[in-house]
Amino acid sequence: MSTGNIEAGVYYESDGSDEHIKKLREYFEKIKEEYSESFGDDLLGFTVNPVKPQSFEFILVGNDDIGLHSYVEVKLQEGIVLGKITSIFAYDMGFFANPFTSQESSVFAPVEDFKTIFSKGKDDEWKKAAIYAYLNNNGNKLKIATADVIGILKDGKLDILRNPFHVGEPVYKISEKTLGKILKKNFSGRDMEVPVKVGVIENSDIDVFVDANEVISKHMLVLGTTGSGKSYFTKRFISSLLESDKEVEVYVLDPHGEYFNDLKSYIDEN
């Protein structure tokens, strides 16, 4: 419920008339529709302090499938905030919290517990067994993920998030519907004029596009470390562009022969 009790029980003593039960059920459904919130299976967690316009952190709630570089969304009244997970940390709020870090002083176990296990005279195998036993009997574990904000989707356009949203907002795995609204749009928020497929989003079958009109009419620089896939991306883009439009002419300066073998089928012998 958005206000009032989180949980509520209703007891009704019927006089045997089904009509009373029917009216009560209709009334309850009306209240539920107006004031309750259903999170759904795509819920990943809830935001925690601090939330910034550039990034936010959230506690994961039982979803072990989510990983680095996954895309997430936060649904607000003014739009949908899009983010990309950049880190995930696993924490233990009991014995395995660091007792020598002041920031965790309120959650770590008593130092005496460490002295008991790591004191002199204890066999190494005994120490391993003691720690393993504690770990498997301790339920005070959680994971916290950090996500960089990509922007906020408003009326089909991707804009900069200028103000932080509230702590405690639900965080969801990004939906295909949301991705479909942005993957064929350019940076201005308009639909791509010539969308060219260059790959798929990691761990999915969702296609990713580049607006060929933006590339051809302007300058584009492909940057990356050695082995990150600069040449592969460029070859993929050129081949997809040539397949989508036979009238396009591309000139490649290839002193090291990186492109010839992969693109020779597109060469006009004349």
Swiss-Prot record:
Q: Which keywords annotate this record?
A: Plasmid
Q: What is this protein's name?
A: Uncharacterized protein aq_aa31
Note whether Mitochondrion occurs among the keywords.
no
Which organism does this record belong to? Aquifex aeolicus (strain VF5)
Looking up Gene3D superfamilies in the UniProt record yields: P-loop containing nucleotide triphosphate hydrolases (3.40.50.300)
> Which Pfam family, just one, is annotated for this protein?
HAS-barrel
Tell me yes or no: is Ligase among this UniProt entry's keywords.
Answer: no
